[in-house]
Amino acid sequence: MKDSKGYLERMEKSMREKLFFLEHIDLDGKIIIDFGAANGALAKEIIKTNPINTTYFCIENNEEFFKECEKLKDTGVLTVSGLTEVEMWLRKNKQYGQDDREVVLICSSVMHELTPRMQKSVVGFSRAYCDYMIVRDMFYEYDSIPDEREKDILEKIICLSPRPDLMQQFFYLRGLSKESIAEYLLKYSYVENWNTEVHEKYLGVDWINIHYFETEEVGVEIIYENYYTNSFIASRVYNTFGIRMNWYTHGQLILKMKRMEVNDYE
């Protein structure tokens, strides 16, 4: 990552939003899996709450961030590069009832980076091994930009974009739609990492697939659900374009899982 410092700084600006689940779940005596942990910033904040009798996994495959997570070893954090390693640990430690602690899977600002197949696999992992699944990510509700505002918003983007070349590249790749307009406003300022950011589908989280598990058939309960407009992003967009973002940009979700039989969860 070209500008990892800038990436981490903007991630930490939304730390309060990422810790929303602390008001709804007691982490004492639980196994915590932080999927896509980056530099371990979320882990550090959770550790400050002094949870008792927990095992904390940071999962991160970026080499630079992996090393940062490893620095938390003295606090009891275990750093691994993938879900498979955690799966093996869970199978070993939960076999024959050796460890009956509940398992919490945290997916904070990471699901949008995954392909649909990988997202499905992560949700399947949560069904097989977890008692709770926590998701916080970007969100766009279909058609939430009103028809009468679409033209005005697009004109402001074209006239006021700080990098017209990058703006043109983005819409060439994404096409022109209300959803792509909303996505551009989320990412236009991340110039230093643009070659990576432009290809990430910010609004690619399959919330419908995740919500499938609230049906009685699979026995999943929604503990908490919230959709909102990120105030930091909304302020930045208004200052740049004079556009008021009166649509949701992010979602927060906590699911209480009923585990299925552990087979091939993919």
Predicted features, each with a name:
Residues K30-A38:
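Conserved class I S-adenosyl-L-methionine
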Residues N39-E85:
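Class I SAM-dependent methyltransferase SAM/SAH-binding core
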Residues I106:
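A conserved beta-strand element that flanks and buttresses the S-adenosyl-L-methionine
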Residues L114-S126:
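A short, conserved alpha-helix within the catalytic core of class I
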Residues C130-E141:
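Conserved beta-strand signature within the Rossmann-like core of class I S-adenosyl-L-methionine
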